[in-house]
C-alpha cells in the first residue's frame, strides 16, 4: 500500500531523539564520510543504529548487540515445532540470480504463526509498493523464517515495565528511547542462515506500537544491515525502505544535526553517490556524482541540485534534493537515489535467466526458453558472434529455425543478451550491470 506523507519538518540530532522520549546521552555525534550500511561501532558489543520518529525524522544511537531479554536458542532445549521453518512469500527464481529478502518474526507464539506470515507478507507489500521496488518485484525472492516465542508480544509494549519471553529478545525502550526497537543481532543471524540466501534482513515484531531500528552491521552471511519494524503498524514499513537505501543502494543519510561542526574538508569527498563536498556547478564542471540529474524534477519534490546539509553535517556537505527518504520517512527516493537502488538490485540479481543452464549442450531438436524478469527488457540473439535479427525479442527459440552452417557435428555458440533500458539509470558505469548474457553450445 502507499503511505500518506509525513510532515516535511525534519527534526535533527537531539531534537529528533527527544521526540521519541530519550536520554540525550544516547545520541551519537557526527561521523565523517562513513558508509553506515557497512559500519559497525568499534567496540564489537555495540552497534550504531538509526532511530525513526513517527513524524518521519531520523536520528542515531548506539545500542548493545545482545538483548537482555533473549530467551530463544537455549542450550539443552529442543526447538519448538515450526521454529526455524522457511516459507516463501515470493519466489521469483533461483537465489543465484535474485535479491533474497529474509523476514524473521519475533514475539509470535506457536499459535500465531499464521499471523506472522500475514504480517511478513504485508511488510513486503509495503516495501515493494515504493519505487523503484514496484517496477522490479520479479528480481526478488522473499523468505519468511518462523520463530516460536514462549510469549506473545514484545518487551516494552505497552509500557517499559512489560517483559516478554521471545525468540529474538526484541524490546522497546532500548537505551531509554521508547520507540527504538532493538534485537539480539546474533540471534537474528542464527535464523537468517536458515534461508537459502540473505541479501536483506527484516525483523517483524508482533506489536502494533510504532517503532523500529536500522542496524549498521555487516554479516558474514552477506547481508548489510538489519531493519526492525512493528508488524502491526502501517507506518513502520518505511523504516525498511530507508534502511535498504543503505544496504542495497549504498546511499548515505541525507539528514544532519543542527549545531554540529562543518564537515572537515580534509576527510575528502565521501564515497556515497548522494552526498558531496561540492555544489551543483562544481559537480557539473567535474562531471561527477549526480551531475547528470541536475535540473530535473525529482519524484521526492523539487529539482535536483545541491542542498547544503547531509551526512550528519549541517555545513560542508550537499545532498541532491531538499527532502528524500534518506532524510526523512514518508518520502520518495530522489532521482540519484533511484538510480543507485536499481544498480544495487542488479548487484545481486540479473536481467536474464533460463531454466536451461548456460553451457548445456543443445541440438537442433531442442527448444530454448529464457526469462526476462523486468518488463521492457530488450533481448537479442547471436550465433558465433553474428546477430540473428529474426530472433530479436523472442523468449522461446525452436533451434530448428536457427541456421547452423557448416558440416554435421559442428558445434556453434548461441548467445542471448538482455539489457534493461530504463531511463532511471544514466551513469554508464552503472548501466554495465543492467546487461547479462547466456550462451549454449549447439551441435548441427
Locate the predicted segments by residue.
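Secretory targeting and sorting signals
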Residues: 1-28
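Propeptide-to-catalytic entry region of secreted or membrane-anchored zinc metalloproteases
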Residues: 34-191, 421-424
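Solvent-exposed loop/turn segments at secondary-structure junctions
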Residues: 106-111, 148-152, 207-211, 234-236, ...
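Short pre-active-site segment immediately N-terminal to the catalytic Zn-binding motif
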Residues: 115-116, 219-243
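Catalytic zinc-binding patch centered on the HExxH motif and its immediate surroundings
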Residues: 153-154, 189-198, 204-226
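Catalytic Zn2+-binding segment of zinc metalloproteases
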Residues: 244-260
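Surface-exposed, short loops/turns at beta-strand junctions within beta-sandwich domains
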Residues: 401-411
Amino acid at each position: 500500500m502507499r503511505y500518506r506523507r509525513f510532515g516535511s519538518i525534519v527534526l535533527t540530532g537531539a531534537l529528533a531523539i527527544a521526540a521519541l522520549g530519550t536520554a540525550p546521552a544516547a545520541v551519537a555525534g557526527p561521523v565523517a564520510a562513513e558508509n553506515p550500511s557497512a559500519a559497525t561501532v568499534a567496540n564489537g558489543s555495540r552497534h550504531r543504529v538509526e532511530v525513526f520518529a513517527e513524524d518521519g525524522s531520523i536520528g542515531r544511537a548506539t545500542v548493545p548487540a545482545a538483548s537482555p531479554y533473549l530467551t530463544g536458542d537455549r542450550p539443552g532445549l529442543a526447538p519448538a515445532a515450526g521454529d526455524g521453518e522457511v516459507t516463501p512469500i515470493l519466489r521469483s527464481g533461483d537465489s543465484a540470480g535474485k535479491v533474497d529478502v529474509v523476514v524473521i518474526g519475533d514475539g509470535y507464539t506457536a499459535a500465531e504463526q499464521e499471523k506472522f506470515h500475514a504480517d511478513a507478507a504485508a511488510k513486503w507489500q509495503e516495501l515493494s509498493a515504493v519505487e523503484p521496488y514496484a517496477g522490479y518485484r520479479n528480481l526478488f525472492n522473499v523468505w519468511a523464517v518462523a520463530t516460536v516465542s514462549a510469549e506473545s508480544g514484545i518487551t516494552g509494549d505497552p509500557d517499559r515495565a512489560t517483559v516478554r519471553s521471545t525468540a529474538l529478545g526484541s524490546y522497546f525502550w532500548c537505551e531509554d528511547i521508547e520507540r527504538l526497537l532493538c534485537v539480539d543481532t546474533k540471534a537474528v543471524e542464527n535464523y537468517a542462515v536458515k534461508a537459502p540466501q540473505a541479501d536483506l534482513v527484516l525483523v517483524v515484531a508482533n506489536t502494533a506500537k510504532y517503532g523500529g531500528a536500522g542496524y549498521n552491521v555487516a554479516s558474514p552471511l552477506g547481508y548489510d544491515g538489519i531493519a526492525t519494524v512493528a508488524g502491526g503498524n502501517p507506518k513502520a514499513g518505511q523504516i525498511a525502505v530507508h534502511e535498504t537505501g543503505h544496504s542495497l543502494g549504498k546511499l548515505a543519510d541525507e539528514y544532519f544535526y543542527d549545531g554540529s561542526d562543518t564537515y572537515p574538508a580534509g576527510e575528502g569527498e565521501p564515497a556515497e553517490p548522494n552526498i558531496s563536498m561540492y555544489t551543483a556547478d562544481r559537480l557539473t564542471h567535474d562531471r561527477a556524482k549526480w551531475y547528470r540529474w541536475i535540473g530535473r524534477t525529482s519524484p521526492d519534490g523539487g529539482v535536483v541540485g545541491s542542498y547544503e546539509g547531509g551526512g550528519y553535517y549541517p555545513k560542508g556537505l550537499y545532498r541532491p534534493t531538499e527532502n528524500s527518504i534518506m532524510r526523512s520517512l514518508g518520502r520518495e527516493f530522489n532521482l540519484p537515489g533511484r538510480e543507485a537502488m536499481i544498480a544495487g538490485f542488479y548487484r545481486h540479481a540479473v536481467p536474464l535467466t533460463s531454466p536451461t543452464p548456460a553451457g548445456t549442450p543443445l541440438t537442433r531438436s531442442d527448444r530454448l526458453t529464457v526469462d526476462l524478469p523486468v518488463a521492457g527488457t530488450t533481448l537479442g540473439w547471436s550465433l558465433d558472434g553474428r546477430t540473428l535479427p529474426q530472433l530479436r525479442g523472442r523468449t522461446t527459440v525452436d533451434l530448428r529455425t536457427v541456421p547452423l552452417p557448416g558440416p554435421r557435428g559442428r558445434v556453434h555458440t548461441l548467445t542471448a543478451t538482455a539489457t534493461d533500458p530504463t531511463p532511471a539509470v544514466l551513469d554508464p558505469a552503472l548501466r554495465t550491470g543492467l546487461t547479462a548474457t547466456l550462451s549454449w553450445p549447439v551441435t548441427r
